[in-house]
A protein has these predicted regions:
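Conserved ABC transporter NBD signature motif
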Residues: 56-67, 71-72
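Catalytic Walker B motif of ABC-type/P-loop ATPase nucleotide-binding domains
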Residues: 154-157
């Protein structure tokens, strides 16, 4: 449904998006995951035709979006990080306003309103000013405004950034409902736990995809054994072990340390020889299933 080929965008000497090529299938949630500055927002702006690339192409349903930008507008919706709601208009007025922008008649908007209120749970607040909504409710309203013209493809740029955990879960529940309706969703996020919810994920760093696939495929493709290490001094242990090239990808989570090793027994002996010099004991080391965050950190560190 979406085919991206050698997509590149430069700002001066900085290459924000570097020769990306990938495809997105109809009816899937495709996650673009990475830290701030990775190039996620630039990529979505390119895909939505807000920006034009220096090189490469994006094709939607075999139509080049840069040659025929208006041909794909009715099938596409893009929600930026800060969606332009009119805060002095009510929830209902915002939906009607964006519906008219998309060329819908008042009767068409009225027909679609019920469904928009159903999935967004905003019906009780339709007469409330948008400026008086919570952050999570504003995001739901922004999504409703994007969907008023019933697009086939939805591009979402960090839609849950700065939103409380409960609202994040509710937002993802809405996305799954849209997925069940056949909408193709491309979502960028800095939250790696959210990436676990996607059908497929591309991890982005410094304008490039460093790995991609289903969350499980990415985890299965990692080299080494993932372990959880508990010591008598986790903070000092992290500082000491990070100085060793084999353990640069170590992550301190609560009171435990998480990392990939080639061999548990050899790694235990090596770490013990380092830590015991500082009177730190290893209490346990156990094999665990890695998260996408564990994989991302290890890939970035090993590639550094």
């Amino acid at each position: 449904m979406i085919k991206v080929v050698n997509l590149t965008k430069r700002f001066g000497d900085h290459e924000a998006v570097s020769s990306l090529s990938f495809t997105i299938n109809k009816g899937e949630i495709y996650g673009i995951v990475g830290p701030d500055g990775a190039g996620k927002s630039t990529l979505l702006r390119l895909m939505s035709t807000i920006l034009e690339p220096d090189e490469g192409s994006v094709r939607i349903n075999d139509v080049n979006v840069y040659d025929h930008p208006y041909a794909i507008k009715e099938n596409l919706a893009y929600m930026p990080q800060k969606f332009g709601l009119y805060e002095d208009l009510t929830v209902e007025e915002n939906i009607h306003f964006f519906g008219r922008l998309f060329g819908l008649s008042r009767s068409e908007i009225k027909k679609r309103e019920k469904r928009l209120y159903e999935f967004s749970r905003l019906a009780p607040f339709k007469d409330r000013l948008a400026g008086n909504l919570s952050g999570g409710m504003k995001q739901k309203l922004g999504l409703a405004c994007c969907l008023v013209h019933s697009p086939e493809i939805l591009l979402l740029d960090e839609p849950t950034n700065g939103v409380d955990p409960v609202s994040r879960r509710e937002f993802w529940k809405i996305l799954y409902e849209l997925l069940a309706d056949g909408v193709t969703i491309v979502v960028s996020t800095a939250y790696l736990d959210e990436a676990e919810r996607c059908n497929r994920v591309a991890m982005m760093f410094d304008g490039r995809f460093i790995t991609w696939g289903s969350p499980q495929k990415i985890k299965n493709s990692m080299n080494g054994i993932f372990v959880e290490l508990i010591t008598t001094n986790p903070l000092m242990s992290e500082m000491l072990l990070k100085n060793v090239s084999d353990f640069k990808g170590i992550i301190l989570t609560g009171q435990s340390l998480r990392l990939f090793v080639d061999d548990i027994q050899e790694a235990t002996l090596f770490m013990t020889s380092i830590l015991e010099k500082h009177e730190i004991d290893i209490l346990s080391i156990k094999e665990k299933l890695p998260s996408l965050e564990d994989c991302f950190v290890d890939i970035v560190v090993r590639g550094a």
